[in-house]
């Protein structure tokens, strides 16, 4: 991902060798005749057998959604819930018995169900070269991601955490929108951890054993909440958040979207609404970073390594959507074994592996540290760590604020490592395009 860029950006030279590339990006080719025939089946597989009740669906248009399409939904007993203008789509509740008739319209491209989506730094910054990038290298100025907007589409961000505030106590979260029906607070803690890995500034780590700053500590954060207290959400909420990010790209200088969430792949990226939304965001000039997923192994233990760690039976072809999009910068996880050196890094067995279902694309694109990353804990729910008290990082000074940091694992936390690195790159070169950042 970063090799070409490193040839002319010395300030982030180490980043070029810190992320291991898994595949080279290629723009999607034109669909074959067989894939074209599949597209003529304009209902997602789960909807083809639906006959009773009302179903919440994502209706993709051929071109802009029109009043005629709204009327067609209404005439069939449906109810339009939300227009997604930037995505040429709408969210609607439609009787199952009317779906086939609606899909037969020439101006309808594809109809999918509103699927469920789910959620998926002590030495991390130094291990991927971010520390050197911040300091500067060979006479080049340091970069911190200053002013670059990173949209965190997740469970929210704990705005009161010191790591998300500037020296003047002003929040670095420049916008916050709640796309769920619940509270805006991050009661699951997932989004706070993700945001901290990408762009926490480590303010609260005074009195701890290390400086737990994220990769781009001066980037701006945009909090787009789509997941509930249990880390679950809907496709429509994610699409709504992506649509909002595209609309407000210039207002908040949104150059990066991080999505540490996903849903199992059930169709080609050519019809999957999340994958198509990733393409739209990329075309709007936003780098979209996605977690690969945590379905890389079964729970069957086949042996133990030299350190006594269990070896699990691996699973292939388990990349989640929207990480299956060729436009997404999809990130798998490594285990850095809590060291700075990379010679002892190994692939995390839980990290989902390619190829992608249906399209057989090589994924993930890169891997980054994703095990035992220290990042901020949410202050919105003191009970979020119950059952995982051993992963709370204890301070070494009695004057330090306790319960400020947590050890996270998963590709959910590998992805924001890369999002932070992209922000550093954009800090150094504002004209960097999403496709150039990816290759």
Feature names for model-found ranges:
Residues 30, 71, 79, 137-177, ...:
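Subtilisin-like serine protease catalytic core
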Residues 343-351:
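Short Pro/Gly-enriched beta-strand edge/turn motifs at strand-loop
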Residues 2-141, 148-150, 162:
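Autoinhibitory N-terminal propeptides
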């Amino acid at each position: 991902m970063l090799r070409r860029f490193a040839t002319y950006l010395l300030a982030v030279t180490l980043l070029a060798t810190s992320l291991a590339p898994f595949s080279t990006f290629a723009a999607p080719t034109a669909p074959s005749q067989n894939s074209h025939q599949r597209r003529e089946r304009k209902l997602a597989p789960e909807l083809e057998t639906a006959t009773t009740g009302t179903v919440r669906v994502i209706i993709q248009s051929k071109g802009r959604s029109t009043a005629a399409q709204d009327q067609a939904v209404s005439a069939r007993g449906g109810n339009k819930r939300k227009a997604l203008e930037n995505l040429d789509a709408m969210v609607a509740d439609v009787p199952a018995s009317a779906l086939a008739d609606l899909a037969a319209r020439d101006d309808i491209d594809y109809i999918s169900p509103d699927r469920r989506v789910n959620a998926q730094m002590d030495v991390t910054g130094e291990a991927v070269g971010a520390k050197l990038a911040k300091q500067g290298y060979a006479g080049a100025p340091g970069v911190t991601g200053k002013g670059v907007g990173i949209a965190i589409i997740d469970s929210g961000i704990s705005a009161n955490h010191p790591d998300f505030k500037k020296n003047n106590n002003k929040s670095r979260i420049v916008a916050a929108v709640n796309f769920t029906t619940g509270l805006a607070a991050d009661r699951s803690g997932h989004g706070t951890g993700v945001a901290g890995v990408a762009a926490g500034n480590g303010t609260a780590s005074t009195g701890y054993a290390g400086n737990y700053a994220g990769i781009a500590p001066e980037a701006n954060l945009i909090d787009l909440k789509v997941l509930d207290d249990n880390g679950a959400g809907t496709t429509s909420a994610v699409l709504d958040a992506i649509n909002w990010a595209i609309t407000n790209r210039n207002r908040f200088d949104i150059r990066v979207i991080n999505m540490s969430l996903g849903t199992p792949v059930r169709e080609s990226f050519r019809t999957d609404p999340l994958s198509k939304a990733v393409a739209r965001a990329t075309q709007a000039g936003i780098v979209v970073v996605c977690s690969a997923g945590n379905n890389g192994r079964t729970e069957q233990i086949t042996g133990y390594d030299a350190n006594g760690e269990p070896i699990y039976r691996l699973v292939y072809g388990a990349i989640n959507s929207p990480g299956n999009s060729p436009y997404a910068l999809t990130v798998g996880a490594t285990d850095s074994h809590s060291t700075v050196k990379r010679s002892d890094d190994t692939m995390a067995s839980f990290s989902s592996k390619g190829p992608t279902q249906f399209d057989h694309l090589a994924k993930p694109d890169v891997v980054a540290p994703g095990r035992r990353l220290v990042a901020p804990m949410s202050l919105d729910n003191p009970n979020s760590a119950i059952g995982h008290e051993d992963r709370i990082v204890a301070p070494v000074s009695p004057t330090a604020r306790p319960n400020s940091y947590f050890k996270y694992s998963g590709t959910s936390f590998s992805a924001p490592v890369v999002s932070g690195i992209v922000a550093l790159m954009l800090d150094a070169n504002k004209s960097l395009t999403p496709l150039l950042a990816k290759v």
